Amino acid sequence: MTSPAKFKKDKEIIAEYDTQVKEIRAQLTEQMKCLDQQCELRVQLLQDLQDFFRKKAEIEMDYSRNLEKLAERFLAKTRSTKDQQFKKDQNVLSPVNCWNLLLNQVKRESRDHTTLSDIYLNNIIPRFVQVSEDSGRLFKKSKEVGQQLQDDLMKVLNELYSVMKTYHMYNADSISAQSKLKEAEKQEEKQIGKSVKQEDRQTPRSPDSTANVRIEEKHVRRSSVKKIEKMKEKRQAKYTENKLKAIKARNEYLLALEATNASVFKYYIHDLSDIIDQCCDLGYHASLNRALRTFLSAELNLEQSKHEGLDAIENAVENLDATSDKQRLMEMYNNVFCPPMKFEFQPHMGDMASQLCAQQPVQSELVQRCQQLQSRLSTLKIENEEVKKTMEATLQTIQDIVTVEDFDVSDCFQYSNSMESVKSTVSETFMSKPSIAKRRANQQETEQFYFTKMKEYLEGRNLITKLQAKHDLLQKTLGESQRTDCSLARRSSTVRKQDSSQAIPLVVESCIRFISRHGLQHEGIFRVSGSQVEVNDIKNAFERGEDPLAGDQNDHDMDSIAGVLKLYFRGLEHPLFPKDIFHDLIACVTMDNLQERAVHIRKVLLVLPKPTLIIMRYLFAFLNHLSQFSEENMMDPYNLAICFGPSLMSVPEGHDQVSCQAHVNELIKTIIIQHENIFPNPRELEGPIYSRGGSMEDYCDSTHGETTSAEDSTQDVTAEHHTSDDECEPIEAIAKFDYVGRTARELSFKKGASLLLYQRASDDWWEGRHNGIDGLIPHQYIVVQDTEDGVVERSSPKSEIEVMSEPPEEKVTARTGASCPSGGHVADIYLANINKQRKRPESGSIRKAFRSDSHGLGSSLTDSSSLGVGASCRPSSQPIMSQNLPKEGPDKCSISGHGSLNSISRHSSLKNRMDSPQIRKTATAGRSKSFNNHRPMDPEVIAQDIEATMNSALNELQELERQSSAKHTPDVVLDTLEPLKTSPVVAPTSEPSSPLHTQLLKDPEPAFQRSASTAGDIACAFRPVKSVKMAAPVKPPATRPKPTVFPKTNATSPGVNSSASPQATDKSCTV
């Protein structure tokens, strides 16, 4: 164990910290002194300039004989100042350089002394007076801002000191508690050893006395041992508590340390530069530039003998640069302005853990804190960005005021024959008192507002810097703690490339494809800003020619991808909407009729190049598709226009930004809504078009699955019905890898396991079943079976719609009246329907032939047997006797009153039986192979299947009867999902869909309720009603998939034998 003498003591650590803080405090004081000194030099320089021009004006009146004397006077003074402070030419500040060249030029001045004298007295000197006043005033305010920032920095350092002291205190308590715990353990060992020795040394006594003594000694020893154990437990709890406090204190210390270093770095690198550049020097160089340019304008009208010297001064004036002067100043006083060394973590008493502890029990706290920091940072960045924009606009206004080009005095030399004309000209220009008073008042008011926003911006940036440093450290630590050693293999997917890849840029096509697949229902898409780091990474990848969004991975932030798409259009050198058509497009917005507006917009846009129109057509088709999910993503066409308008169409300069932006938003909204009427169709303009099916193109991996034709995809009803039909057909799959579910809804399975897939929950998840348990299955861990009969055939949407509109041609009636069917009857029905199913590959024709409207008791009983066929086959070793069926028949048939079995046709159950791959999953591989390859079936196998089917059906009916009167219990699936937005809404379970959906869509009946506990027992009969009008399946995140949210159905017509009414407030599934 390391000796404590080697560790730094608390006093040593605090002393080192105090020393470092004192050095920083002294450095901050020297910074203010340095800035004060620069202000004094500046004021002195401006005062010298005023004196210079005043004296020069007087000398001009006495001709040029006195100019040499004046020049020598100031040249001598300048030489002495330069020798003392500026020994090297490269360290001379630009204003001082101009001053030196100006003095050298004075010797040349000998003509036009009267005009120059008037200009000096009435124009240039007042300018320097204003510059001096402005410089002093601005420096005072700059000093206040700098002092505030220094106070904030010292406050951060004091907070770090407090956190460090807290860390020392808790760590010392932890060490003390540990030592006390060890002492208690030693006492316990000592007591146990002492007890053993006393028993060994005990001398023999009389029986009675010996027994009494032993009892007393045992009682004393037990009492002592219990006391020691209790003390040990208390000290153990105290040590655990103190250790946890020490860990939290160390984490807090590390976070504060990171935030302090970031604040110090930000102050020295950014804040000082901004204070000098944007506060102290605000308008100084520009005003000085104007004054000297006034002088230059007068001097350039002199004789050619002056040009050589004046060119040198002009060059120096052109080089008046605040940035260069700031750099020279910092180089001259490098020790004052250089950032100090970073604060390093000081381990206390051997605590060498210099990283955040992200393990339990502080991990959840750190995760929550990281999320809170991220939310807070998002808000602060938006607010600070708005303040920055306001500050920059105000700064531009001030720069416009101080850079007014009013230094030209060439009019004063327009062949004036008298001094009166010159004086009148001068007085009418710069020194007009009403004009200058108004200008000065406006400038001071703008400056006050600017400094208010500047202070607010710097304080906000300071807070963001601290929070960002903490957030980054937390995120880095949490990311490393959750990283696993082995990565799971992922299914590789091929990226489809368009034939005309040059027509749509890769970044546009890839971002839109990704959002169409994963982000149509992402709330706040294009409105919420994403991570700037991820936006830059994705942008850089596209610039390298890569496609970072290719494949099925969904590990990108949706807001960042949306930001990349907006950034691309905002950064185009030639925007999609050129400025030369801006007025024509805005004129279209004034039309009230939406159709007429679309026609006029089309006429204006048709003049654009074809590649631009192709991109516009592709983009706005996507935005229209996105707006159809406004209930989920909260982005209707108007919101999309607000977010996308500034990126696509900028307001030209010289226009009112606020009013014009409102027109631009209305224009983009109109194009989104009327994009089909505005842009040419593919026949008129060849090129790639946005396909709404793109988001669904990778949902099925089966090579036998049929794809929807382009002609059918344009019909909403057909596409929606086709989607509903696909969801009703289970698919068999094989696990590629082992998978362990992370939540209660995720299924766990081993490599090679057979899985049953019901429907797609998202791009990354399936709803399915394994080992009789329903749940979610990851898509990238499975392979869909590709056998001749392994993929359920799908009927075309057109044929199914026709079948829905036609009356039923055949009806299957029950063979018995009020009694339940026998086992032989069930076998006949089962075999007959298997043969019909084989002969009719079109599911639509099967549905047409076997639609049943029998709702009497007889059909209910017959359907109860069909229910068993559609349910999961449960093997049973006990045969079902025929004499038992009539006995149980009345009980089973009575369930139809509230179980709604009368609404299930034979065809529905039998078709579901045939569609389900569970029919192929029998006891031996030979049976499954015979079903898949359509080989002759073994009679023994058929008998076993029929026996298992009837047994399963009767067991399920008994379970249904038992639970029909039971109290409703919470549904495991429904109660764990998020609350649905619309009410009433039927939540889907993880059971396979059945053709009952199609029948209910055709013949709507009131929804019956069931106990939620039967969801795992009745496999196919009880399914939630699916609405005909479905937008698209929900695309949830990969970490926790969410079920599809269906809109409210309109099935209100009562059934034949039903008397119950649907209850909207109940969360139970309905039939």
UniProtKB/Swiss-Prot annotation:
Site for Arginine finger, residues: R527
Positions of the F-BAR domain: 22-325
GO biological process, one term: regulation of synapse assembly
Source species: Mus musculus (Mouse)
Keyword vocabulary terms for this entry: Cell membrane, Cell projection, Coiled coil, Cytoplasm, Cytoplasmic vesicle, GTPase activation, Membrane, Methylation, Neurogenesis, Nucleus, Phosphoprotein, Postsynaptic cell membrane, SH3 domain, Synapse
Database matches in InterPro entries: AH/BAR_dom_sf, F_BAR, FCH_dom, Rho_GTPase_activation_prot, RhoGAP_dom, SH3-like_dom_sf, SH3_domain, SLIT-ROBO_RhoGAP
Cell location: Cell membrane; Cell projection, Dendritic spine; Postsynaptic density; Postsynaptic cell membrane
Bias (Low complexity): 855-868
Outcome, altering W765A: Loss of the ability to induce filopodia and to initiate neurite outgrowth. Abolished interaction with GPHN
Post-translational modification comment from the UniProt entry: Methylation at Arg-927 is required for the stimulation of cell migration, dimerization and localization at the plasma membrane protrusions.
SUPFAM superfamilies (alphabetical): BAR/IMD domain-like, GTPase activation domain, GAP, SH3-domain
Name of the protein in question: SLIT-ROBO Rho GTPase-activating protein 2
Disordered, as annotated region: 181-211, 700-726, 795-819, 838-918, 984-1012, 1029-1071
Biological function: Postsynaptic RAC1 GTPase activating protein (GAP) that plays a key role in neuronal morphogenesis and migration mainly during development of the cerebral cortex. Regulates excitatory and inhibitory synapse maturation and density in cortical pyramidal neurons.
